[in-house]
Amino acid sequence: MVPHGSCPSGAREVTFEGWRRERGEASMSDVHRTIRVNRSGSKFRRALSFFGPGYLVAVGYMDPGNWATSLAGGSRFGYALLSVVLLSNLMAVLLQALCTRLAVATGRDLAQACRDAYPRFLAWPLWLLAELAICATDLAEVIGTAIGLNLLFGIPLEIGVILTAVDVLLVLYLQNKGFRRVEALIITLLGVIALCFLTQIIMAQPQWGEVIKGFAPTTEIVSNPDMLYIALGIIGATVMPHNLYLHSGIVQTRDYGHTTAEKREAIRYATLDSTIALTFALVINASILILAAASFHATGHTGVEDLDKAHALLNPLLGSAIAPALFAIALLCCGLNSTITATMAGQIVMEGFIDIRLKPWIRRAITRFVAIVPAAIVTILYGSQGTTELLILSQVVLSLQLPFAVIPLVIFTAQKKKMGSLAAAPWVTFLAAITAAIIVVLNLKLIYDFFTGAPI
């Protein structure tokens, strides 16, 4: 393993100007460059060395917020909004590709880049906003996991919320076993989720001709205000700010070398990994919408927007008790996956922005305590309806923070002074700027709608 800041003899490390501060110790230093890259094997074997981090990122694109918008879109408008799911995924692929480029080119994750590029009076507010986003993310995962436990085992929501604290032990165990073990668990759970939805879709028997047509955009999406509103929700719930910090940190678990040629190859293979993984996330999100369209919209149930109602309707509509059980299992797996990745994102944010390095269990306990307390209070006082409202609030908080992660990412990767010859091409920056503008505008609109109570 090559220590951070050094390079093997005979290889010249590429360093760039343009930063206010010198690069410090890497975040998650216990796993930094711990996974060997096969540099002498075939292209396939070298690419396989980078296989993994993209799937941890893909978890963030299958959170309960995405489930809710996909259920609403499918139940109300059938397959028509599949094109929007595809568009939002393409946006995500582009932004996550920039994350890998930033990390490999500069040796910094997004949090470190913000710290080293901006004065403290800007960097510290960005850190506080990022921490708020991590807490909101964890809150959503607590609620999603608790709902999954309730639907699958009948455990009361308030008890399920408290039980989510147990995953601290799971995270600690996995981190001690090595980063590849973490990736293996995540990919296994994603496989379970895919199997659950594949089975449910086979049961639902969707109209595949209509499914294919749904991936082609139509003018009705813009001309129909109700359809446009749901479409905005799908796009607005797609890119999660913590994923940008997470991806730029965990891609550096690979020991990819220090020369420009080695870094170019690392960017190429890491981008391939995330693109394949996000395509998998696209399949899952499309599956949720297809399931809702085939099960709910086709039978006249056009108002299914929350997880409880969807679960309750699957049994009578599909004529099988297996379908709702699979739905609950998939939700629970999503919750477990997300708690692991949210922990890592929280560690990267804290270490990257302010260089405070807590023991993983302390960091995890603090984040989970902040999430459990409001979730427990709301479930005790207001029940399942309260958790639904809290879930919506967590998505609004994430929307508020998103511009403060996306905009620096696009700016950094465009600057040759910081990135050198590995800076993003002008056309990539142009597309990324448009993507960032669209996401920011849509999120601002969703926030406006949340506080005014009605779409504009």
Curated annotation (Swiss-Prot):
GO MF, one example: cadmium ion transmembrane transporter activity
Subcellular location per the Swiss-Prot or TrEMBL entry: Cell inner membrane
Any Pfam family: Nramp
Highest taxon of source: Bacteria
Main location (coarse class): membrane
GO cellular component: plasma membrane
Keyword Transmembrane helix: yes
InterPro entries: NRAMP_fam
Keywords annotated in UniProt: Cell inner membrane, Cell membrane, Ion transport, Membrane, Symport, Transmembrane, Transmembrane helix, Transport
UniProt keyword annotation of Cell membrane present: yes
Membrane topology according to the record: Multi-pass membrane protein
Regions crossing the membrane: 47-67, 77-97, 123-143, 151-171, 184-204, 227-247, 276-296, 316-336, 369-389, 392-412, 422-442
One Gene Ontology biological process: iron ion transmembrane transport
Function (record text): H(+)-stimulated, divalent metal cation uptake system.
Annotated family: Belongs to the NRAMP family.
PANTHER family the record matches: NATURAL RESISTANCE-ASSOCIATED MACROPHAGE PROTEIN 2 (PTHR11706:SF33), SOLUTE CARRIER PROTEIN FAMILY 11 MEMBER (PTHR11706)
UniProt-recorded name of the protein: Divalent metal cation transporter MntH
Organism name: Brucella melitensis biotype 1 (strain ATCC 23456 / CCUG 17765 / NCTC 10094 / 16M)
